Amino acid sequence: RLQEFYNAYTNMIFTRKWLRIYLYSGLKGLDINRWYVGVVQDEILTRVIGECRHEAGLPSHNKPTAAELEMAWVFHSGIFYYGVRKYIYESPVLEDKEQMISDALDAFLAGYEKVFGSAVNLPRAPVKAVG
């Protein structure tokens, strides 16, 4: 399901126009950028984390930790930056976007299980969000 979602999601946002508007709105400090970041975190990344927890047999009803959210942002941002490199910087990228997404998903899911697999409920040093 994540592969299908990210294929469809990137089909919508991977245009030079969309990426330029998004990036410029962030540089200008416009509310639309902050709103969209909130939507991505609340509607996409939180659900991705819930699915990861479910797959790992962990409780999925708890709010994501700061560390989980950061790892999900790193994953999501890597896919996003592929579009920036291709459509804004016009840099060479792997032409098979679906393969890039599949590889990113494999790395993220394996990494999630390695980092959080059985440690979500164990006490950890608090992670403080900055900004």
Regions found by a protein language model. Give the residues of each.
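Amphipathic alpha-helical packing segments from all-alpha helical-bundle domains
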Residues: E4-K17, I21-L23, D31-L58, E70-W73
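A conserved short alpha-helical segment within the catalytic HATPase_c
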Residues: Y6-N7, L105, L109, E113
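Conserved catalytic core of Hanks-type protein kinase domains
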Residues: M12-I13, G78, G111
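Hydrophobic/aromatic-rich alpha-helical bundle segments in the mid-to-C-terminal region
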Residues: Y24, R34, E55-D106, V115-V127
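Short histidine/acidic/glycine/proline-rich micro-motifs that form metal-
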Residues: L27
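Acidic, Ser/Thr-rich low-complexity intrinsically disordered segments
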Residues: A129-G131
